[in-house]
Amino acid sequence: MLIHFDAMETTLIPHMRGGEKEVSAQMYSDSLGKIMRGRLIPGASIGLHTHETSSEVIYILSGAGKVLCDGMYEPLAAGSCHYCPKGHEHSLINDSQEDLCFFAVVPEQ
């Protein structure tokens, strides 16, 4: 299956998972999971949440920020990848002065 993000409508998600500001995203989802290309403007975040029935992989396309995973902060930059296993919690934070663009896959398990 081909997923063409540039052909998808951009959705603005305010305060995603209780985070700051909004996430702009193109997203594909079905019963097996979600695939998303997203953007966080400076100061925006995806709030802290636990992956009860899924895991998540986030690959940073451009920009920089940090992730809070199980109480520990990890820096993120273009080319880095974050993995949150099933049963763990995390939050994606753009604490930089530029947009943070990412690709995320959330497979149900």
Describe the predicted segments one by one.
Residues 36-51:
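Conserved short histidine dyad/triad with adjacent acidic residue
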Residues 72-86:
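Short acidic-glycine-tyrosine-enriched beta hairpin
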Residues 86-109:
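Ligand-binding loop in jelly-roll beta-barrel domains
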